[in-house]
């Protein structure tokens, strides 16, 4: 039996992070967590990290797709926060972002890590951006790095 697993240390990785400005008071913490994980755990060099800001979570798939198509990056990390309100807007934005990012990953065949919080409240979002529930930005970064190495191992 063959088993493929990979670690997260990827010093030569070229990683793009696309991040939503909307809810930036939460997203800034996700970005800090992602960059810290890339550098400290993944050993990614600062010059190999590109950050692209977009207006909101709905725009993340378009930016991620454009970044993936350049061929310059080994992975894309998408960061944002969608908080449920009193209308159906939450479902459209959260669904559009998650489905769009999944399509980008499948079409480009590079890892697109989903670091978009979809929460019921601001409190839940804050918990997932570096307090009680860890930092989902850091988790997305580690996922991206591991998947870079998993795909390399599959293709080897």
Swiss-Prot record:
Gene Ontology molecular function terms on file: 6,7-dimethyl-8-ribityllumazine synthase activity
Enzyme class, first EC level, given as a word: transferase
Keyword vocabulary terms for this entry: Riboflavin biosynthesis, Transferase
Origin superkingdom: Bacteria
Keyword Transferase recorded: yes
CDD domains listed in its UniProt record: Lumazine_synthase-I (cd09209)
Protein name per Swiss-Prot or TrEMBL: 6,7-dimethyl-8-ribityllumazine synthase
Name of the gene this protein is made from: ribE
């Amino acid at each position: 039996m063959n088993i493929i697993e990979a670690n997260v240390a990827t010093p030569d990785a070229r990683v793009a992070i696309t991040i939503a400005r909307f809810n930036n008071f939460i997203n800034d913490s996700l970005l800090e967590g992602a960059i810290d994980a890339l550098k400290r755990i993944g050993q990614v060099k600062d010059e190999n990290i590109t950050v692209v800001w977009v207006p909101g979570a709905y725009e993340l798939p378009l930016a991620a797709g454009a970044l993936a198509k350049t061929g310059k990056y080994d992975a894309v990390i998408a960061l944002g926060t969608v908080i449920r309100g009193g209308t159906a807007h939450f479902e459209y934005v959260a669904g559009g972002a998650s489905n769009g990012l999944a399509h980008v990953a499948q079409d480009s065949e590079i890892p697109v890590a989903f670091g978009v919080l979809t929460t019921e409240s601001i409190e839940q979002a804050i918990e997932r951006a570096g307090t009680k529930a860890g930092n989902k930005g850091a988790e997305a970064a580690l996922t991206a790095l591991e998947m870079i190495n998993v795909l390399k191992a599959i293709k080897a």
